[in-house]
Amino acid sequence: MSEIRTGIVAAARWGIRNEPRIHYGAVRPIPLGRELPLTTDCSGFATLCYYLAGARDPNGRGYDGYGWTGSLLERMENVDRRAVLPGDLVVWGEYPGHHCAVVLEPGDDPLLASHGQERGPLAIRFSDESRYQPADVTWLSSLP
């Protein structure tokens, strides 16, 4: 696994460990750093993970802080679920998207880092998260 992908997963796991201090809110600009407490939404959390890992902005905005789920769908490449790797993203719902999560472990039922309105970042299986999300799913990558 590449250093960038390892870094994205490490950042997502940092978020999971700090779940009580990471709150949900559609805040723009997206806070980019490890200062806690932190308020962000699902796409902001995914963007933060990429930023902390030193990856290019998955929103294609140069980390200006104004990316959102729709810009992830616009800028990242669709990948087949069987080709998903750690650090890739999954988006539920048609454009502009309803919810996104970071892939921690791929496989038949990928393990995700999901940050939603109900609670801060948590590790959850794709099948479990999908019970609460729209049926339309897009798997995304912008990583080598």
Regions flagged by a language model, labelled:
Residues 1-61, 113:
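N-terminal capping segments
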Residues 1-10, 62-79, 94-144:
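Aromatic- and glycine-rich peptidoglycan recognition patches
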Residues 86-87:
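Loop/turn positions that initiate beta-strands
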